[in-house]
A protein has these predicted regions:
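Signature of N-terminal electron-transfer/Fe-S-associated modules in redox systems
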Residues: 1-153
Length: 153
């Protein structure tokens, strides 16, 4: 039995310890906000926070995150930074197809938690591993800047 802390809730699972966190979230807990994209930690659609850091859940075994605080897209809006990012995403009309957006939001929230006023280069570096098939990168950057301004006020 492995115990996980997901969105401030204790979850126990009998899944194999090498089961990727993504499948516990989606298949066992029906938390479908975190997406499966590539399965190789290359696209960022599966990004969640583990102990405050962005992690690719598609390749992260549950044994590696047992006892650590896991935050998903379903709960990021409860934080000041996460709410600012989500609100900016709406104002800037970031999503097109929307598939990558949960991972994008999670990466942006992690960036703004650490860097309150990122430059374009810092935004690009932080968001580098999050792919968007629809190429909404200019709107993603604009939303991150808007969220940073909101957090500064």
């Amino acid at each position: 039995m492995i115990t996980l802390s997901i969105n401030d809730k204790r979850v126990e699972t009998k899944a194999a310890e090498d089961t990727p966190l993504l499948w516990i979230l989606r298949d066992h807990l029906n938390m479908t906000g975190t997406k499966f994209g590539c399965g190789m930690a290359l696209c960022g659609a599966c990004t969640v926070h583990v102990a405050g850091e962005p992690v690719r859940s598609c390749t992260t075994p549950i044994s590696a995150v047992a006892g650590k605080k896991i935050t998903t897209i379903e709960a990021i809006g409860a934080t000041r930074v996460g709410k600012a990012v989500q609100d900016a995403w709406v104002v800037e009309n970031v999503p097109q197809c929307g598939y990558c957006q949960s991972g994008q939001v999670m990466a942006a929230a992690a960036l703004l938690r650490e860097n309150k006023k990122p430059t374009d280069a810092q935004i690009d570096e932080a968001m580098n591993g999050n792919l968007c098939r629809c190429a909404t990168y200019p709107r993603i950057r604009a939303a991150i800047k808007r969220a940073a301004r909101t957090l500064a006020s």
